[in-house]
Amino acid sequence: MLDNSFYTAEVQGPYETASIGRLELEEGGVIEDCWLAYATAGTLNEDKSNAILIPTWYSGTHQTWFQQYIGTDHALDPSKYFIISINQIGNGLSVSPANTADDSISMSKFPNVRIGDDVVAQDRLLRQEFGITELFAVVGGSMGAQQTYEWIVRFPDQVHRAAPIAGTAKNTPHDFIFTQTLNETVEADPGFNGGEYSSHEEVADGLRRQSHLWAAMGFSTEFWKQEAWRRLGLESKESVLADFLDPLFMSMDPNTLLNNAWKWQHGDVSRHTGGDLAAALGRVKAKTFVMPISEDMFFPVRDCAAEQALIPGSELRVIEDIAGHLGLFNVSENYIPQIDKNLKELFES
């Protein structure tokens, strides 16, 4: 186990953990003691009909959701709903390569985990800890959108509403190549040592390279041309790296990022229907608003729209934002108001 203050409540905000026991993985591995970190807001009502699940995205935790999306002035209103954000397996807070006490799966030996494994684990936690068997809604961004799609395809009778934001039900070839490049940024660092480093600081050069790759692709070309980084209080394009992305990514655990990236690469709900994506999405019963971000270079509108057309009764709600994919961090003034408007309408449906 490695010490890394980035993955603590002091940095990420309060959370709890719960063990769901032995989890057999789709790829054949096993996590003997699978425990998940989660954070909640609001009160579960008597008939347990007001629960909203928020899965987490690549490199992220519940923190951004609680800081930017949840509040009595937002659609995700804890005075109305019981909101639970469950950190995905391998994200640094839930059981992960660097925090497991099981030496057989620590560090480079941590098994490959699929999106489906996360959803099965989340379902088990919700039942075990709260007695929740149905969800008012699932809302997730990026890899959280992948998990949202998995929920509504795997458990179509358990989810009443869904909002996948800036993500797809089946990963695209472009994103597969991009995530492979993300992996190479850290794997090429000699300090990575095949995943058996003794501190994330030994992989500083690789983590910095990953930060720079996110700067190039995570923010759109318009974000840079219009100097939209000024809204973040930054003084130059160089400070986007030096004062924002570099400190963020250089605090992270490399094996955690690799585990997340493999999962992202292999996200595909059509595994439930023999590779037939239309059949998989045709199973969805939840009222679904698909919300791509207009300038997203990972999950462009046309990819999300093509999937939305396969979901019965769904709607395409494009979020207009020049920030691109990292607009998920609430970079632009008009971002959260659009999210809130769409979610409020979805929740009232």
Swiss-Prot record:
It is an enzyme of class 3 (hydrolase). The active site is at S142, D296, H325. Keywords: Hydrolase. Its EC number is 3.1.1.-. The keyword Disulfide bond does not apply. InterPro entries: AB_hydrolase_1, AB_hydrolase_fold, HAT_MetX-like. Residues 60-329 form the AB hydrolase-1 domain. GO terms for biological process: biosynthetic process. The keyword Manganese does not apply. GO terms for molecular function: homoserine O-acetyltransferase activity; hydrolase activity. It comes from the Bacteria. Gene3D superfamilies: alpha/beta hydrolase. The 3D structure excludes the ability of the enzyme to bind homoserine and acetyl-CoA, indicating that it cannot function as a homoserine acetyltransferase. Esterase that catalyzes the hydrolysis of 4-nitrophenyl acetate in vitro. Belongs to the AB hydrolase superfamily. Acetyl esterase family. Homodimer. This is Probable esterase Cgl0839. It comes from Corynebacterium glutamicum (strain ATCC 13032 / DSM 20300 / JCM 1318 / BCRC 11384 / CCUG 27702 / LMG 3730 / NBRC 12168 / NCIMB 10025 / NRRL B-2784 / 534).
